[in-house]
UniProtKB/Swiss-Prot annotation:
This is Putative replication protein. Pfam families: RPA. Residues 98-198 form the BRCT domain. The lineage of its organism: Bacteria, Pseudomonadati, Pseudomonadota, Gammaproteobacteria, Enterobacterales. It comes from the Bacteria. Keywords: Plasmid, Plasmid copy control.
Length: 275
């Protein structure tokens, strides 16, 4: 199906007139949403079906799972892919953007450095289902004089627009971004991340990179206690196991963009920018 055929197909099968074809746009740089980098709304392991409650300062987040578990940090790649494509379109054409995004699994797999096996197509379906079903309840959206509790999903909806030859040749997929994520993108509450993020295979390492990127920012370094880092990752492992994994990461020191050091005596982690 060529580009013009895709557009004709979508117009015939779309009730909402405005849509964005992600395949048409090359990602100039990858972007991540700030709130989800600051707080652990995505699970670090698959199949986590427990209701999770996270408290940090004045922030309370309750995460309710689907039958298949909470959306995990690898499911978040769909988010990152979507907002990166939209931001690239804004940068290039200063275009109005749509919450309705259409893409082929192939473009998603290539962009996020995934393999294109039959299993990958099935896992993409499951990831979309978890994103739709996971519910977040939080008071995070508040100002100094006003606090507001909200409940929302991680995507509003998804559907497969076309399918050929079973699982191995799925056609275009449509997702509708939630309003709050759409607003975050329009208000530039996003941060540029390394394209090597997708090469990070351990979920805990991905989460630690997010925290380093969010807090280090343009500073030369960022320090945090091990216990605070443990809390902010959303890890459900024992603290001693978290420290074991942390020491492994420190030895390898292979996070994109950042060096990581561990002061055992003070129990402090230091992230510093690579130059």
């Amino acid at each position: 199906m060529n580009l013009e055929e895709k557009k004709v197909f979508l117009k015939k099968n779309k009730k909402i007139k405005e849509f964005f074809i992600a395949d048409d746009v090359k990602i100039s740089s990858f972007r991540n949403e700030i709130m989800s980098m600051e707080h652990p709304i995505f699970s670090l392991k698959g199949g986590d079906t427990r209701i999770r409650i996270y408290e940090y300062g004045n922030v309370i987040i309750k995460i309710k799972p689907t039958a298949d578990g909470i959306a995990n940090i690898f499911d978040k790649d769909i988010w990152i892919y979507s907002i990166s494509k939209l931001q690239s379109e804004i940068n290039k054409n200063n275009s109005k953007i749509s919450k309705a995004i259409c893409f082929t699994p192939y473009d998603f797999f290539i962009s996020t450095k995934r393999n294109k096996s039959g299993r990958s197509y099935e896992e993409l379906r499951k990831a979309l289902s978890r994103l739709k079903g996971t519910i977040i309840e939080t008071n995070i959206f508040y100002s100094k004089n006003k606090k507001k509790s909200l409940s929302f999903g991680l995507i509003d909806s998804w559907k497969i627009l076309e399918e050929k030859k079973g699982k191995l040749n799925i056609g275009m997929i449509e997702i509708i971004l939630p309003e709050w994520l759409y607003v975050a993108l329009k208000n530039k509450r996003i941060l540029k991340i390394s394209e090597d993020y997708f090469k990070i295979r351990k979920s805990i390492d991905r989460r630690i990179y997010e925290i380093a990127r969010k807090h280090c920012g343009n500073q030369k370094f960022f320090k945090i206690s091990t216990k605070k880092l443990y809390l902010k990752t959303g890890s459900t492992s024992l603290l001693k196991m978290f420290k074991h994994n942390l020491k492994r990461l420190v030895r390898k020191n292979n996070l994109p963009d950042y060096n990581i050091r561990y002061n055992l005596y003070k129990d402090i982690i230091t992230f510093s920018k690579r130059f």
